[in-house]
Regions:
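Short, surface-exposed patches at the edges or C-terminal ends of soluble domains, predominantly
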Residues: 2-235
Length: 235
């Protein structure tokens, strides 16, 4: 009788252990299939606004693919790297809703030969109409260092054979020879974090905005007056 009880207890313990391991494996499988995260920040920095989700989900808002090139890559100060990761996370959230209508890539503008770099810098800068460079002075391993970064993104969108392009400036540019210290950048980066989603979705909205057809109204030949055409003008 005692032997039977020991055997039953042995079987019970092993069965319980198998159930526990099976449950853990099942939870891991479910977690890999379902993407979710909890936002515990006061300003819900890591959650998308409802208006953003609605806009991205509607195919009529983004009819074809938007290509986004972000020029924050390479050997960067940790504060800038953290901000870069925030951009990457936000764009990943955008893509999870918009699917292949949004594509993005992070580019190191300092790769390649000096001539290739200068050519890319000129394209990014676009005579002051594109992304403005930012010089940062910081201390690393007891040595004062200086780096020039391009804290922005280029966006392109093709619709009906027409290519539209625009730029986003995430962090302000600096004058040549007047770098920011990392201590000065703290509030600037924090503000950029807070406005990141707004700046991204605003740029996408502007880029994909459909042109309104204009209607011309003639006067003086018996046509409807200004009051009578007011509703049509509002369309």
């Amino acid at each position: 009788m005692k032997l039977q009880e020991l055997f039953s207890k042995y079987i019970y313990n092993w069965t319980l252990l198998l159930f526990i391991f099976g449950g853990i494996i099942l939870l891991n499988i479910i977690a890999s299939l379902i993407s979710f995260k909890f936002d515990m920040t006061k300003d819900h920095r890591y959650s998308l606004a409802n208006g953003t989700e609605i806009f991205l989900s509607k195919k009529e808002n983004i009819e074809s693919r938007i290509s986004i090139q972000i020029y924050l890559e390479g050997n960067l100060p940790s504060e800038i790297t953290n901000f870069k990761n925030a951009i990457k996370s936000k764009l990943k959230d955008f893509k999870s809703i918009a699917g292949n209508r949004i594509e993005y890539i992070f580019i190191n503008p300092n790769n390649g030969t000096k001539d290739a770099q200068n050519e890319l810098f000129a394209q990014i800068y676009d005579r002051g109409q594109g992304i403005l460079p930012l010089e940062i002075s910081y201390l690393k391993d007891g040595e004062q260092r200086q780096v020039m970064i391009w804290p922005g993104a280029k966006m392109s969108y093709s619709i009906n054979g027409i290519i539209k392009e625009s730029s986003i400036q995430f962090l302000p540019g600096t004058k040549p020879g007047s770098p920011y210290g990392l201590a000065q950048m703290t509030d600037i980066i924090e503000n950029a974090h807070n406005n990141l989603e707004y700046n991204l979705i605003s740029a996408i909205r502007k880029l994909t905005q459909k042109e309104k057809k204009r209607i011309a109204f003639l006067h003086g030949h018996g046509e409807l007056n200004l009051y009578q055409t007011q509703r049509a003008r509002a369309l």
